Amino acid sequence: YQIPLELRNLPIIESALNPKAVSRVGATGLWQFMLATGKTYGLQVNSLVDERRDPIKASFAAAHYLSDLYKVFGDWNLVIAAYNCGPANVNKAIQRSGGSKDYWQIYPYLPKETRGYVPAFIAANYMMTYYSKHNICPMHSTLPAQTDTMMVARNIHLQQIAGVLGIDIEQLRALNPMYRRDVVPGATQPYAIRLPLADVNRFIEMEDSISNYRASELLTNRMQVEVNDDVPTYYHKSKRYVKSRKWRVTRRSHMHRGSKSKARRGKASHSRKRSKARSRRRR
């Protein structure tokens, strides 16, 4: 995408390099993609998989997005500002400044958070370049330096892999942060898992044993609420016929993808009560 190498340090101020980071407004992953932007750039998000949390896929998506922003603004400082507050806010700041496309000229018209964002990015780049001059020592990663990616075409739980291959479950989660519930839903479509290179051949040889290990316990089918499902559709999927006037889901306003809900029969209306009473009197 022909973007400056220094932009690799952007996740330092976005997420502190935490692939599972979630902001108060729902931005997720190393690059803090909002749901709509992530989907625009090809990142899959559902109740089991959130590719915004995949460091590799999210980095490709971020590079694509940053490249697109540069085509709009033609200045990397403005691109970085737009990455933080959105291109619409940067355009407003440009208009209020009289049409200038210099970051420091539009600085007073940017949102407060964004005014500190570009300086923070400059500071992060300085730190990553000159850390040794300030006696800053990098921490060594506890994750394996060499990994490989395997495509899986069946449902597998990370605990199945950990149990059979003897890999630490937290290490597996760190290598595969995109799986929100530790489930790789390969039966729906092939998904990739990352393993320490030393364990790849054993995984290939023992895949059937891994798939059968505690399968009934770890891969029990659970009904999930999809984002676009309304309540009657949700119960139709679970093979129950539901009429919305007879049933209601409690606290529906808090439902989201993957959430569980309770349903209870609503009280009969006064008109129905009166009609039932008249019916009994006629008998």
Language model feature labels by segment:
Residues 4-12, 28, 76-81:
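Alpha-helical scaffolds flanking conserved acidic
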Residues 11-14, 34, 107, 175-176:
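A general structural motif at alpha-helix termini
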Residues 1-16, 63-67:
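Export/targeting segments at the very N-terminus of extracytoplasmic proteins
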